[in-house]
């Protein structure tokens, strides 16, 4: 009997959000309200039983929906776990998709990894108004804020889906778009193992630390990775041959010799560009830049990796760079964001290692699920549910050699510019902080050119991803990865007597200054005890609160 074809389910798009107690260290926030918007109806609920009421109401809807929550896979969905059953998709501890009855829940952050505030349509609010003892008197304002978030998210997601389809992640979306211009095939596991030693990430390095007063400039490359994809050639197959000399077909080199800050080696704490001698694995792009700048002095070439099939990704980059430029000129902020994400999200997908992929399932507690008890399986038990994970049976290897070449090309651009920098203080992937930068193309819009992003007269550098640049009394640029030193809630900093956009701008500057003061303290030899008010929810229901002592590195 011929197999019947499955009827495709037509899903309606919806946006959803919980409002909870404000974040406070060691206090697990509880939802007190939810909002739901599908483009036609908006529904909200207020009360301590809002979780149960949401599921009860959702089960009355007969039309299947895909329901998006921004960062839902790390927050909102965790309040609903006991209602989920069946297969779910999890990547790096984030729930990407899970089902409840006829509906699917998806984390919109997976396709739009930007804060909602990037849309410039998000309403700001003082989260202190959401404390239990005060929220009733601010109910109307809170519900307006909640509705605004739902409507904005629905708009963003709907526009994204209209352009790219109902994709699960931005990386998958970007690769799907790239394949329309540059078709590629998966590669073999053995090829991945052979090429992976040549893959490294971006360069981040503090050349000086402390509090530095000088004429300071911040330069960055316009779209570094799209530039590397378009304007450098890259291997584009899994067919290669080894030799011991460099030719026009060489893309990777294993060599022994002297390295003067040109190329990295891996350490337990990350990439190190300061190993002066030894054996190195280097892309041809960095090799050429190192030879030209005198920062690579080889004693011998151990082997070269050579490819006959190569490409640039010019058609893909030109298409979306042009679309992004048109969106900018039209004042279309949403599509400007979309195209920027597409341009910057494909190269990393080539480097993904699928060996740690897992298939996940969620069941009620107290049962045994066959097939999830072998090697590499994982079981996370909770009172109300059990999460079961096992190694994925079907997966593809993308071409890590492509990613190794693209990231190597990006580092080569940075290396050449560092050689032209006057008093380089700091660099990170596509940017250099220095006194001046000469003999490089300067243009605010040209792909691959350098742009003067900021200027200042004082900088506090405490380590990698930890600096604050000042112009006078104002912090104009700040980095504090791993510890949110800049207040996320800027509502309480907004002057009440100002027009909202102007008040928001003032609050953002105040928030930067607050973060900058903390980095000044650390860069001056002190320490800062960071207490994260935001909880870290685990899939098994556990909640962690992070404390860190931040000091110079």
From Swiss-Prot:
Sorted UniProt keywords: DNA replication, DNA-binding, DNA-directed DNA polymerase, Exonuclease, Hydrolase, Multifunctional enzyme, Nuclease, Nucleotidyltransferase, Transferase, Viral DNA replication
Catalysis performed (reactions): DNA(n) + a 2'-deoxyribonucleoside 5'-triphosphate = DNA(n+1) + diphosphate
Keyword Hydrolase annotated: yes
Gene3D superfamilies, A to Z: Palm domain of DNA polymerase, Ribonuclease H-like superfamily/Ribonuclease H
SUPFAM superfamilies: DNA/RNA polymerases, Ribonuclease H-like
E.C. number: 2.7.7.7, 3.1.11.-
GO molecular function per UniProt: DNA binding; DNA-directed DNA polymerase activity; exonuclease activity; nucleotide binding
GO BP term, example: DNA replication
Record InterPro entries: DNA-dir_DNA_pol_B (IPR006172), DNA-dir_DNA_pol_B_mt/vir (IPR004868), DNA/RNA_pol_sf (IPR043502), DNA_pol_palm_dom_sf (IPR023211), RNaseH-like_sf (IPR012337), RNaseH_sf (IPR036397)
Keyword Nucleotidyltransferase on entry: yes
Coiled-coil stretches noted in the UniProt entry, renumbered to this chain: none
Note: This DNA polymerase requires a protein as a primer.
Domain comment quoted from the record: The N-terminus contains the 3'-5' exonuclease activity and the C-terminus contains the polymerase activity.
Function (record text): Replicates the viral genomic DNA. This polymerase possesses two enzymatic activities: DNA synthesis (polymerase) and an exonucleolytic activity that degrades single-stranded DNA in the 3'- to 5'-direction for proofreading purpose.
Protein family (similarity comment): Belongs to the DNA polymerase type-B family.
Stated name of the protein: DNA-directed DNA polymerase
Organism of derivation: Enterobacteria phage PRD1
This protein's encoding gene: I
């Amino acid at each position: 009997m011929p197999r019947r074809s499955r009827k495709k389910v037509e899903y309606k798009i919806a946006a959803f959000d919980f409002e909870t107690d404000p974040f406070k260290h060691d206090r697990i926030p509880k939802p007190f309200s939810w909002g739901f918007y599908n483009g036609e109806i908006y529904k909200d609920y207020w009360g301590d039983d809002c979780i149960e009421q949401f599921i009860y109401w959702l089960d009355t809807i007969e039309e299947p929906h895909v329901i998006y929550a921004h960062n839902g896979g790390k927050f909102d969905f965790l309040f609903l776990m006991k209602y989920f059953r069946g297969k779910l998709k999890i990547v790096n501890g984030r729930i990407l998709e899970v089902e409840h009855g006829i509906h699917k829940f998806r984390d919109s952050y997976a396709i739009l990894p930007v804060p909602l505030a990037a849309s410039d349509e998000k309403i700001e609010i003082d989260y202190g108004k959401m404390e239990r003892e005060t929220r009733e008197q601010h109910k109307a304002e809170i519900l307006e804020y909640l509705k605004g978030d739902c409507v904005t998210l629905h708009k963003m997601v709907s526009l994204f889906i209209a352009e790219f389809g109902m994709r699960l992640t931005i990386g998958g979306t970007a690769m799907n778009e790239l394949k329309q211009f540059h078709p590629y095939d998966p590669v073999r596991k053995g090829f991945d193992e052979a090429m992976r030693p040549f893959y490294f990430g971006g360069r981040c390095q503090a050349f000086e630390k402390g509090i530095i007063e000088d004429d300071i400039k911040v330069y960055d490359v316009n779209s570094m990775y799209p530039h590397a994809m378009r304007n450098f050639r890259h291997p584009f197959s899994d067919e290669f041959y080894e030799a011991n000399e460099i030719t026009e077909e060489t893309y990777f080199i294993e060599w022994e010799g002297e390295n003067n800050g040109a190329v990295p080696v891996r350490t337990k704490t990350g990439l190190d560009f300061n190993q002066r001698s030894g054996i190195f694995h280097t892309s041809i792009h960095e090799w050429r830049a190192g030879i030209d700048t005198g920062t690579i002095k080889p004693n011998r070439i151990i082997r070269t990796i050579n490819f006959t099939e190569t490409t640039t990704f010019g058609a893909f980059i030109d298409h979306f760079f042009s679309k992004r430029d048109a969106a900018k000129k039209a004042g279309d902020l949403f599509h400007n964001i979309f195209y920027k994400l597409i341009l910057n999200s494909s190269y990393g997908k080539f480097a993904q290692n699928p060996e740690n992929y897992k298939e996940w399932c969620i069941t009620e507690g107290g049962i045994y699920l066959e097939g999830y008890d072998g090697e590499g399986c994982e079981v996370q038990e909770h009172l109300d549910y059990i999460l079961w994970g096992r190694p994925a049976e079907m997966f593809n290897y993308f071409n890590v050699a492509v990613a190794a070449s693209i990231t190597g090309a990006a580092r080569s651009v940075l290396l050449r510019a560092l050689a032209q920098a006057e008093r380089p203080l700091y660099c990170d992937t596509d940017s250099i902080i220095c006194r001046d930068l000469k003999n490089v193309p300067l243009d605010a819009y040209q792909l691959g050119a350098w742009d003067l992003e900021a200027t200042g007269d004082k900088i506090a550098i405490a380590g990698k991803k930890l600096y604050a640049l000042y112009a006078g009394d104002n912090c104009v640029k700040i980095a504090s990865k791993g510890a949110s030193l800049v207040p996320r809630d800027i509502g309480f900093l907004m002057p009440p007597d100002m027009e909202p956009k102007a008040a928001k701008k003032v609050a953002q500057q105040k928030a930067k200054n607050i973060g900058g003061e903390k980095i000044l303290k650390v860069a001056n030899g002190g320490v800062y005890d960071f207490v994260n008010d935001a909880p870290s929810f685990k899939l098994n229901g556990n909640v962690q609160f992070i404390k860190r002592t931040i000091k110079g590195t």
